[in-house]
């Protein structure tokens, strides 16, 4: 990491992951891992990224992967859907398959970042016909891999990967915990009874209560939580998406002020910014299709979006 400063790395990721202050901690943990690898240390520091749906979890992975593909192309950034993992000996992907992607880089010796997405899905008990908790078995299978050991790659029987050199980042929305937060009533001194926030941070204790294996949760050094987006952050996200749509459709798009208020409410719903992006795209596509069906050959001067999610066209007067 001699050629890349932490500040530079962090700023680049924050251009993509907007409005999440805790993304700095994600960047720091990754940067510190690479510093340790550069020193020859085998001390990996796995962590959990808990983020409500649509708040930047997947974008964090994509931003980190894109950055290292450009700046440190020798470093593998692997995506694994943990919800597809099965207990060793059963049909499907057993826990050891999580290292297979590291073999795409020759002589990696296990150096790389493995993003275990949907890890929260494996922390909920799931029982087979014999009453065995199969998800607990998967968690136990991941234990020593995350802690660090040599693993024989399932698709290359002659190759062994040392996961002491690997950084594991478990990711999840933890919707099952958030649902219980919303249902739970609590009373504090001087406060009235009310519901807890869907966007409150997830704790180790809540993971354990939901069914996570204590030993596995303990292997992760820290939990990083993403939170509710601010109005300023939503404005930036709307502007960024509008810019991308303008370039894609080769038009100018103007956004009225009430759009930002409407999109703020959308962004902090249970679907997050993912729904915001879908709404903007659907409205622009619908109006572009209408324009083309009407036989308008000249591009419109502007699509104007309003807070109801509708838009209208304004054409340049060429007469």
Describe every region a protein language model picked out.
Residues 59-62, 169, 175, 264-319:
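C-terminal engagement/docking regions of AAA+ P-loop ATPases
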Residues 35, 39-80, 104:
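Walker A/P-loop
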Residues 3-46, 287-292:
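Pre-Walker A (pre-P-loop) alpha-helix and adjacent loop at the N terminus of AAA/AAA+ ATPase modules
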Residues 53-55, 67, 83-87, 119-122, ...:
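Conserved nucleotide-binding/hydrolysis micro-motifs of P-loop NTPases
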Residues 78-109:
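Short glycine-rich substrate-engagement loop in P-loop NTPases that contacts/grips substrate
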Residues 30-31, 210, 232, 236-250:
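Conserved AAA+ ATPase "sensor/coupling" helix adjacent to the nucleotide-binding pocket
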Residues 2-26, 83-92, 228, 232, ...:
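Dynamic helix-loop-helix/coil hinge segments at AAA+ ATPase domain boundaries and subdomain interfaces
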Residues 59-69, 100-106, 120-232, 244-245:
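Canonical AAA+ ATPase core
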